[in-house]
Regions:
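Gly/Gly-Pro- and Ser/Thr-rich, intrinsically disordered tail segments characteristic of DNA damage-repair
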Residues: 1-204, 217, 255, 330, ...
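Short glycine-enriched, charge-decorated loop/helix-capping segments at active-site entrances
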Residues: 28, 284-286, 334
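Short Gly/Ser/Thr- and Asp/Glu-enriched loop/turn motifs at secondary-structure junctions
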Residues: 81-85, 123-126, 262-266, 311-315
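DNA-contacting surface of Y-family translesion DNA polymerases
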Residues: 160, 168, 173-313, 325-329
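Aromatic, loop-rich ligand-recognition surfaces of beta-strand-rich domains
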Residues: 322
């Protein structure tokens, strides 16, 4: 949202004059020693020329939803960990037909198109993928091929592995275990005496042998709707631009419908305007479909119901619903537009 801030020290947090705390900061600010949870007054002392701003959490959630939807375009198996982190399963022949590196590059390019950075790690399990994603932030893409996990992990400090905090790291240091390679070779009995049943799991993870599945929150629930929306950096005012945006969003919805084996009978078009309010329009189709050529054409007809010349469109969305499921629990899958 502020391209003029790029490359400059930026701090997000409370005011330094009111006992505020740093929520996060740019990499440029981190070079001065600033970090999250630091007192704002201390951060200002370390980096007096930093740009300060308060958190805009509605915007963060909006962009997060756009990123998660990009992931959902690639695979139905998306496990969201936090607002800015997710695991996805792109195992060739299982959920994705291409080499994982090609998929990862495409995701990276699409996320960059949103104006945000992402770092991607690709591996055979969550531990390896997460550590790989930390390698070259903020634009990194690191792939660890099958069979190379131990070599990749061996020289890294034990703190590189999630779940090993300061307390566990200190106990490992007392055992003269400093790297993941050393942890992978530690006797099982020794680790069990200190960490109990978690000791063996720690060792397996350090060996790169963890078995972990990506689990979607909606995996065993019935999908109620599949939708895609986008907030525009600049309001759309021309009908042609609005129609093009709806068509592009519809292509993504169509791909996801086909990937999940769904056909929908109701089309929903959603617009939000520059002054904050919004409207939706719906139409039921004579037959369920997963073909965007069909439901996008209907959405464009619905445009006349909720838009007129002169209206400034800030957000557009298109969705399909009314799927024919048998049993299950219904939940919305309204993904508007990663471990990333």
């Amino acid at each position: 949202d502020h391209p003029e801030w790029r490359g400059k020290p930026l701090i997000v947090g409370g005011d330094a004059d009111s006992r505020g705390v740093v929520s996060t900061c740019s990499y440029e600010a981190r070079r001065f020693g600033v970090h999250s949870a630091m007192a704002s007054a201390e951060a200002r002392r370390l980096c007096p020329k930093a740009i300060w701003t308060h958190g805009h959490f509605d915007r963060y959630r909006e962009v997060s939803a756009q990123v998660m939807a990009i992931l959902a375009d690639e695979t139905p198996r998306v496990e969201r960990v936090s607002i800015d982190e997710a695991f996805i399963d792109i195992t060739p022949g299982r959920f994705a037909p291409e080499d994982p590196l090609l998929v990862a590059r495409r995701i990276s390019d699409r996320v960059a198109g949103l104006g945000v950075t992402c770092s991607i790690g690709v591996g055979c399990n969550k531990t390896v993928a997460k550590i790989a994603s930390e390698r070259d932030k903020p634009f990194g893409l690191t792939i660890v091929r099958p069979g190379t996990e131990q070599r990749f992990l061996a020289a890294l400090p034990v703190s590189a592995m999630s779940g090993i905090g300061r307390s566990a790291e200190e106990r490992l240091r007392r055992m003269r275990i400093y790297t993941l390679g050393e942890l992978s070779r530690a006797p099982e009995s020794t680790l069990a005496s200190i960490f109990g049943v978690n000791g063996e799991r720690m060792r397996q993870r350090a060996q790169g042998l963890e078995i972990s599945e990506v689990t979607s929150l909606d995996e065993e629930r019935e999908v109620k709707s599949v939708s895609n929306e986008r907030t525009f950096a600049k309001d759309l005012t021309e009908r042609g631009d609005i129609e093009a945006a709806i068509a592009l969003l519809g292509e993504s919805v169509g791909r996801r419908l086909r990937r999940q084996g769904l056909t929908g009978a109701t089309v929903t078009l959603k617009l939000k305007y520059s002054y904050g309010s919004g409207r939706t329009a719906q139409r039921r189709l004579p037959h369920p479909t997963d073909d965007e050529n069909i439901f996008v054409a209907v959405a464009l007809e619905l445009l006349d119901n909720i838009w007129q010349d002169g209206m400034h469109v800030r957000l557009a969305g298109i969705g399909m619903s009314d799927f024919d499921h048998q049993g299950g629990i219904q939940t919305d899958l309204f993904l508007s537009l990663i471990h990333i």
